Amino acid sequence: MATVEPETTPTPNPPPAEEEKTESNQEVANPEHYIKHPLQNRWALWFFKNDKSKTWQANLRLISKFDTVEDFWALYNHIQLSSNLMPGCDYSLFKDGIEPMWEDEKNKRGGRWLITLNKQQRRSDLDRFWLETLLCLIGESFDDYSDDVCGAVVNVRAKGDKIAIWTTECENRDAVTHIGRVYKERLGLPPKIVIGYQSHADTATKSGSTTKNRFVV
């Protein structure tokens, strides 16, 4: 009696599944998903709260340090915006190893490009200008003169806020003026707005309420 062989069901071809698995693994292991993007410098963010019962240095507190793009944004998104700080408070972002004070070895012969804002600009411009300042610093936006940059400070004050970029050598005209021009352009300030650069020594010894400008752009 003849026997009929049962039909054999074709075995599914495994390679596509393997390919899918491989693709899936590649997607999970994509370096862009877990490798952080290093910055050229390590930076330290400081906070100052004006408590008159304490010394100036006791009021200055180191918040955190970072050296990657991702860690910068994690920190920035975690802290209060400058516009929400109480009057008398400061944020300072400086290269690691430089303290946000005139007396620091890297600052004592330097100065600052100063942006002054009126009270109405706290809501419209302060946070935008400060973020752009931070991005200028960590992005090394000043070409060959980025090494001259020490850090930046935002002062929140009742009469009007200030933002400044500090450089290490006030006599270095080429570096100072280049930094000032780039900074003014990055902030989107119109040509009619003039910003000034003041040495820390002049600021410390000023006799009136204003300090003379060494340079303007």
From Swiss-Prot:
MRNA binds at W56, Q57, W102, E103, R157, A158, K159, G160, D161, K162, T205, K206, S207. Residues 1-27 are annotated as: Disordered. Phosphorylation increases the ability of the protein to bind to mRNA caps and to form the eIF4F complex. Phosphorylation also enhances its mRNA transport function. Phosphorylation at Ser-209 is not essential for protein synthesis. GO terms for molecular function: DNA-binding transcription factor binding; enzyme binding; eukaryotic initiation factor 4G binding; mRNA cap binding; RNA 7-methylguanosine cap binding; translation initiation factor activity. PROSITE patterns: IF4E. SUPFAM superfamilies: eIF4e-like. eIF4F is a multi-subunit complex, the composition of which varies with external and internal environmental conditions. It is composed of at least EIF4A, EIF4E and EIF4G1/EIF4G3. EIF4E is also known to interact with other partners. Interacts with EIF4ENIF1/4E-T; promotes recruitment to P-bodies and import into the nucleus. This is Eukaryotic translation initiation factor 4E. It comes from Oryctolagus cuniculus (Rabbit).
